[in-house]
């Protein structure tokens, strides 16, 4: 039985004080959650949020990282720096990183391997555009992403990967894939993992849905056979909203 994982991606929002305030409000609201609870603040808030979550059931993720250990990479953060801070997860390959910063699947794969080398669990994002969805190439496109993104891992690493399926057309648009569409695509993703690493590994991989997830949509999504959680955007910025999703 896969344990659900619900992560709040705060994107480029919240000062340090605002981030800590949300965490303090969130802690009592999610203390009895049956799923893994993760918040993903900006780099500048990571340390303060990590300290604020101490002793709680809330885990902390970075929103990105470089794959190199150190060096002349101005503006970047290394996996070793995150590990030293005690960060448990890192979001990799988000569609905004792919679109605005030209991240490739090959670079994402290097980051996935670097995360595991530093005891950080990657949350690997994939998803299609509306044009791809309407052209009927969703499954092929996402398979191409996943086959590169999580290539070359050990079986022990592969089963720990969290995959987030985020249809790009549903991010921040208010549109959402139907629960059937989401489950069908996530099942297709799981079948790609079967091809790569076998059924035993694929059955352990947790696959989230992301894309305008709200408290009023989460229950029906989580009732589906293959949806193991959510990567939440805007609705994770307020403790009340996010706890409503976590406590589905």
Curated annotation (Swiss-Prot):
Catalytically driven reaction(s): D-glyceraldehyde 3-phosphate = dihydroxyacetone phosphate
Binding site for substrate: 9-11, 172, 212, 233-234
One annotated GO molecular function: triose-phosphate isomerase activity
Any one Gene Ontology BP term: glycolytic process
UniProt pathway: Carbohydrate biosynthesis; gluconeogenesis; Carbohydrate degradation; glycolysis; D-glyceraldehyde 3-phosphate from glycerone phosphate: step 1/1
Enzyme Commission designation: 5.3.1.1
Active site per database record: 94, 166
CDD domains given in the database record: TIM
First-tier enzyme category under EC: isomerase
Keywords on record: Cytoplasm, Gluconeogenesis, Glycolysis, Isomerase
Gene Ontology cellular-component terms listed: cytosol
Gene3D superfamilies attached to this UniProt entry: Aldolase class I
PROSITE patterns: TIM_1, TIM_2
Localization per Swiss-Prot or TrEMBL: Cytoplasm
UniProt key word Transmembrane helix: no
Pfam families: TIM
Source organism, top-level taxon: Bacteria
Function: Involved in the gluconeogenesis. Catalyzes stereospecifically the conversion of dihydroxyacetone phosphate (DHAP) to D-glyceraldehyde-3-phosphate (G3P).
Oligomeric and partner information: Homodimer.
NCBIfam families: tim
PANTHER family: TRIOSEPHOSPHATE ISOMERASE (PTHR21139:SF42)
UniProt family annotation: Belongs to the triosephosphate isomerase family.
Protein name: Triosephosphate isomerase
């Amino acid at each position: 039985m896969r344990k659900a994982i619900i992560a709040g991606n705060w994107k480029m929002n919240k000062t340090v004080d605002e981030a800590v305030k949300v965490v303090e409000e969130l802690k009592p609201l999610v203390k009895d959650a049956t799923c893994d609870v993760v918040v993903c603040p900006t780099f500048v808030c990571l340390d303060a949020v990590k300290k604020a979550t101490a002793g709680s059931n809330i885990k902390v993720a970075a929103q990105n990282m470089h794959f190199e250990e150190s060096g002349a990479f101005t503006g970047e953060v290394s996996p070793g720096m995150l590990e030293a801070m005690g960060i448990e997860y890192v979001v990799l390959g988000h569609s905004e990183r792919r679109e605005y910063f030209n991240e490739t699947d090959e670079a994402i794969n290097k980051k996935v391997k670097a995360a595991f080398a530093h005891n950080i669990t990657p949350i690997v994002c994939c998803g299609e555009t509306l044009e791809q969805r309407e052209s009927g190439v969703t499954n092929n496109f996402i398979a191409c992403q996943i086959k590169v993104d999580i290539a070359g891992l050990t079986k022990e690493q592969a089963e720990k990967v969290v995959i987030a399926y985020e249809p790009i057309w549903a991010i921040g648009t208010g549109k959402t894939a139907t629960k059937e569409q989401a489950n069908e695509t996530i099942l297709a993703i799981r079948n790609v993992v079967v091809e790569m690493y076998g059924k035993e590994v694929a059955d352990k991989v947790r696959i989230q849905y992301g894309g305008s997830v709200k408290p009023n949509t989460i229950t029906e999504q989580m009732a589906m056979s293959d949806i193991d959680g959510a990567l939440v955007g805007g609705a994770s910025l307020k403790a009340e909203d996010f706890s409503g999703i976590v406590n589905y």
